[in-house]
């Protein structure tokens, strides 16, 4: 069955206009009325340490986890009913993400701007930078139907969510050693081709502690070479301020999600893997605000390339 019908049930005009009113979501335009690049304003965010703000933050976090627990329990039950139908479970997993992710972002209350949404329904390998737990909420809400994600194999041991992740046919990677990781990537690529799916990956391989962009792993390029799917970069800004790693405090920092046009991989060659990684990493460096750019180390530029 074709899984490329990617429009989300939450993207109807009425619901979308309601969401824009609630979150301040808009697509910037220039004087001619055409979409234009909106400068990131997350760096201008000023923290508020008043006690009422701290209390509200605790309430929001509690509401997020309670809400997620309820929807996760409900969808685990649905998945068990749909056990004989793998593709139906993939679609239900996406539906769970759309409902839960949108609800969690509403609870957090961050103003959100989405740009380039015309590229959000392509069957592709979606990649995005990872600096906060909020990134996961956004991805859950925004990914098109027929999309699976990749996580470490240990996710199955996360109570409720791990079981739902597996039941929804999301992919897992064994990172215990390089050979196991390579074989896992091959299995992911085969599953994506066989089931006609899209895929979303955090190419850094982990969450940044500081919000600054980390070097990219090569796994997403290997998958692109095996599937020949285009790569759609998604640049997330401001999420590192909205919910910092290892913090119990959320903040109403403005968030921007920007989709870039698909990068075709039809003619890519395996000998140029390092070049492709550097090229896409440089795209992120160019479009992230100063607070999220990687620090320049001696002998290397901001994109991680050698200056020599």
Curated annotation (Swiss-Prot):
It catalyses: a 1-acyl-sn-glycero-3-phosphate + an acyl-CoA = a 1,2-diacyl-sn-glycero-3-phosphate + CoA. Its EC number is 2.3.1.51. Coiled coil: none annotated. Its main location: membrane. The keyword Transferase applies. GO terms for biological process: phosphatidic acid biosynthetic process. One of its GO terms (cellular component) is endoplasmic reticulum. It is an enzyme of class 2 (transferase). It is a multi-pass membrane protein. GO terms for molecular function: 1-acylglycerol-3-phosphate O-acyltransferase activity. Keywords: Acyltransferase, Lipid biosynthesis, Lipid metabolism, Membrane, Phospholipid biosynthesis, Phospholipid metabolism, Transferase, Transmembrane, Transmembrane helix. The chain crosses the membrane at residues 65-85, 124-144, 148-168. A motif (HXXXXD motif) lies at residues 130-135. It comes from the Eukaryota. The keyword Membrane applies. InterPro entries: AGP_acyltrans, Plipid/glycerol_acylTrfase. It is found in: Membrane. Belongs to the 1-acyl-sn-glycerol-3-phosphate acyltransferase family. The HXXXXD motif is essential for acyltransferase activity and may constitute the binding site for the phosphate moiety of the glycerol-3-phosphate. Converts lysophosphatidic acid (LPA) into phosphatidic acid by incorporating acyl moiety at the 2 position. This enzyme shows a preference for medium-chain-length fatty acyl-coenzyme a substrates. This is 1-acyl-sn-glycerol-3-phosphate acyltransferase. It comes from Cocos nucifera. The lineage of its organism: Eukaryota, Viridiplantae, Streptophyta, Embryophyta, Tracheophyta.
């Amino acid at each position: 069955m074709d899984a490329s019908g990617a429009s989300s049930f939450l993207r109807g005009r009425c619901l979308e206009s309601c969401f824009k009113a609630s979150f301040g979501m808009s697509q910037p335009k220039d004087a001619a009325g055409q979409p234009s690049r909106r400068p990131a304003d997350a760096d201008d965010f000023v923290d508020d340490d008043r006690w009422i703000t701290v209390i509200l933050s605790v309430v929001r976090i509690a509401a997020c986890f309670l809400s997620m627990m309820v929807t996760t329990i409900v969808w685990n039950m649905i998945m068990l009913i749909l056990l004989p139908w793998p593709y139906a479970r993939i679609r239900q997993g996406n539906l769970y993400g759309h409902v839960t992710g949108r609800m969690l972002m509403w609870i957090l209350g961050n103003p959100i701007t989405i740009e380039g949404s015309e590229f959000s329904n392509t069957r592709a390998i979606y990649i995005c930078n990872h600096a906060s737990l909020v990134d996961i909420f956004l991805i859950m809400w925004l990914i098109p139907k027929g999309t699976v994600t990749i996580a470490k194999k240990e996710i199955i041991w996360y109570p409720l969510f791990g079981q739902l992740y597996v039941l929804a046919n999301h992919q897992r990677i064994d990172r215990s050693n390089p050979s196991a990781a390579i074989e896992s990537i091959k299995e992911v690529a085969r599953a994506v081709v066989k089931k006609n799916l899209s895929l979303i990956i955090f190419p850094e391989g982990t969450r940044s502690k500081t919000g600054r962009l980390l070097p990219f792993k090569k796994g997403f390029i290997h998958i692109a070479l095996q599937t020949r799917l285009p790569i759609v970069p998604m640049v997330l800004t401001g999420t590192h301020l909205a919910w910092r790693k290892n913090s119990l405090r959320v903040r109403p920092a403005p968030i921007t999600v920007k989709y870039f046009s698909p990068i075709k991989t039809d003619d890519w060659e395996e000998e140029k893997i390092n070049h492709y990684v550097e090229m896409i990493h440089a795209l992120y460096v160019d479009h992230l605000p100063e607070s999220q750019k990687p620090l320049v180390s001696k002998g290397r530029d901001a994109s991680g390339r050698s200056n020599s």
